[in-house]
Every structure is written in C-alpha cells, then in structure tokens.
Amino acid sequence: DRSPSRGLGDVYKRQILDDEIPEVYSIEDHRLDEDTVSYLQGKYPHIETDIIENFPFETPRVGQLDIIQDINDAIRQGYKYIILEAGTGTGKSAIATTLAKMYGSAYILTMTKQLQAQYADEFDFPLVKGRQNFACLNDNLESTCDMGTCKTTPTSSNFFCPYGVAKNPTLDAELAFEDSYGGTVFYQSGQHCHYWNQKANAVNSPITLMNYDYGILELNYVKHFGTRSLLILDEAHNIENKLMKTMEVNLFNYRLEKDINKVISKETLKDGELKDWIMEIAAITESYEDIDIKDISKNKADRVRSTIGRLKSLKNNLEKEPKNWVIDADDTGVTFKPLKVHHYAANNLLKYGDVVIFMSATILSHKMFSKWLGLNPNEVYHIKVDSPFSKEKRPIILDLAGKMSANRIKDTAPKTIPILQKILEKHK
C-alpha cells in the first residue's frame, strides 16, 4: 500500500510487527539427534561425545571437530586465553557455537552485521540490540524506543510506562531478569516493551550474541549482563582498535557551554600541560556533578552520568599513565586517545569471560597480539589452522576501475558496474 496517508508511524508498525523478538535460547533443543550422534561417533571415535552432541551440523568440515577438541583440552589444562587463527573456510562460527553450547554460558561478540545475522539465522542465538531498533509501544509505534516518552521525560515527572520494567514490582508483576548484581527487574504489565522483551530474553539466554560497541557499553556501564564461562570474540584482530575507540574522550566547547555553561580556556587549548588538563578535567567533572538530573530528560541524564564516569576514568588514567595518552587540542576542543590498551583490555572487556576465545583469520603474530592486549603468555594457547581452500582456488585478481577517493568516486563508481556484473555472472 503506497497510499500517501500512510505515514512514519505505519512504517514503524510494519517494521516492528515483522520483527520477531528472539526467544530465550535452549541448548537442549539444539543438540543433534541420537542417530546422527551415533553415526558421527563411529566416524570420529577420538572426538568426545559432548563435542559431537553440541555440533550444529550433521556433517563437519575437515578438521572442525579436532579444533574443538584441541580448544577444549587447552581449557581443561587451565589456559585462560585461546587464540584460534583459522583461515577462511575453516568454519569458525560452528566451532564457536559448539563450544558455547558445551560450556552452557557464553557471549559471542562480532564486528559486522553480516556475521551477526549468520549467527542469529543459522544457530538461533538471540541477538541483543539497542533501543533505536525498536518502535515504542507507548508512543503508538510512532517513535523508536531511544526517543520514547520514558527516555525524553525527566525523572521528576514520575512518568509510568505500562509496557516497561521496574525494580519495584506491582502485585502481579512478572520477573523480567536478574542483573549482574543479582537485583531483580520486573515487567510492569503483561504487554512487554519490545526493547525490554528482547533484552530480557538475551539476559536469560545461556548464549547471547552482541556487537562489540553494545557489549562493551552494557558490560561496563549498564551491568545487566554478568560474567559468563566463555567470552568468544570473533574478528578479534579488530579488538585493539575497538577498545582504543571506546576509551577515547572528546570534549568540545560547544557541548560544554550548552551542558555546564563553561568552556576550556584558550590558554589550556593552546599550551596546556598535563597538570593543566588534569585540573581542567576535575573542574569539568564537578560541574557535571552539579547538574540536577531529576529535572532533565532521562536521555540527557544518562549522558551526564556517562560523561562523569568517563571523565573520572580519564583523570585516573592520565595520572597513572601520562605517557600512554595523546592529547590533541584545537580551538574547538580536545581529544584524549590511548596509545596502547594493554593495561585496560582485561578490565574493559576480557574479565567478562572465565575463558576468552579470540577468533580471526588474520592474527598474523599471536605473540604481538597477546602483548598488545596485555595477556600473560603463560595463559595463552595458540592454534593456527590454514584455510582448507588451496591457493589456486583463492587467487587475488586485480581489476582496477580507478580511485575511490571522495573527489573521484562519482567518476569511478559507474566503471565498477561492468566489473561487478562480470564477477557475479562467473559465480552465479
């Protein structure tokens, strides 16, 4: 129906009604049947039954079960960190799935939406998403949950959302989930907010799928998710850059002036030394702490609390490791960036798994990778597996169309179309 009377609300309604809320994952419902297990046991007598039962497919690829057995043996030997460097075609997602099911408690973090979709679609793992992905029931599905009434009204308004959650239950309240501290969170009614419903199911699932940005935020600040037996980090070669980005702090004068009616002095921006910046950060933090968050929107209150926490952490890091931080200032503001994350990786991410499994096709040097993340070499077990595809079957073919820089892309992009068509025709 393309009638002009159908507005934005209808778009959201169609989107959310078509979007299934992931159910709580059941490991028991995703084990292989007895006949398949018996067949695979006969074919792979050296592989433990637990591995075969939890493998997601009836036919393993060459070497997959042996890799899982190797990782499982390493965990039993007490290794805290497992680095699986496996080439394209190894089937790393099936390996991760089997181990997650075996240990019964795991997070799987991925970088790309494509890989998230693969895990969610192929293995039925619940993918937990942010508020912006769900339409607000209280707003008649005409806004997303990040802009719903519960996030845009101040605490002092005493707004009550019948679809949301609360720590203080009503008489007939249904338990939604327990947070990482053991605190209980309850639904307010029998009709559940889509955002909270999917999040509760993800918390209650033994295996949960997240992207890195959401996972780092949730685990460190929101605290609804606790530590699990396994933390499986896919595309792990990106972790150092991802942690650096999440630790980066930006302070812009236009934002400071709007929030706290203050700006960083021109003198500090131009010639500020470390001690000047530490004093500046302390003063800015105090000003944010003076904001009465009861009278501002919950979205802004969340941002203020987050800013205070990040500034305190930054001040502490600058005092402890001043040489590890780059201070990049201009006349509009300042950016603080860490040079290395080796002292922060464990506390900001790795501690949320009793055992951490890093997976990538491109680790290159596991010793340098371990050093960059501050891993104890005695706790690291490295497995390297070449791609099962021969070099002849994975050639690199250059077919250049031109430069793709911002000022050239308009000319170059059309030239790529026949090249892409040729590739698609060859492999259809």
Question: Where are these predicted regions, by residue range?
Answer:
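Walker A/P-loop NTP-binding motif
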Residues: 70-74, 93-105
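Conserved pre-motif I regulatory segment
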Residues: 37-83
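Signature of the SF2 helicase/ATPase Hel1-core->accessory helical subdomain module
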Residues: 101-102, 117-122, 190-207, 211-295, ...
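Conserved strand-helix element at the start of the C-terminal RecA-like helicase core
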Residues: 106, 427-428
